[in-house]
Amino acid sequence: MTDQENMKAAVPDAAKRYMRYLLIMAGLGGLLYGVDVGVIAAALPYIEQTAGFNPSQLSQVVAAVLFGSVLSSLFAGYLADKMGRKALITIAAALFTLSIPVICLSQEVFGIMLLGRILQGASAGIVGVVVPLYLAECLSAESRGKGTGMFQFLLTVGLVF
């Protein structure tokens, strides 16, 4: 094979690897979103038992993630244009990562628990806006359906588990 033929063969392989990478990242973004929103279902009985929150406070703990999601999704598109999609996805992952120790360390402190849940929601709102946007820009027309399907499938898996 000539060098030119080798280059032509390498480009499709590199493009395929990049598409696979994007599909995996789409799936992980969806999974992160699903876990952000759905993690409370498994944790709520434990929180109720150990933290001593009243029913109103427990409702607020559940709803706080939606509040954070609404707030961040209002600005996610604008921030994605200003900061870049990858940077904002990284920030969303960092917010989620930060929310875990905040929630774990909250013990019986209601306000800190709310802060952790709002951080989780902010992460979910960003992911819900920016990951599909990033996929639409990066995936070929033939792969966009796979990418958004993978995002939605793993989002649902994250909600359930």
Where are these regions (language model features)?
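Transmembrane-helix signature of 12-pass secondary carriers
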Residues: T2-F161
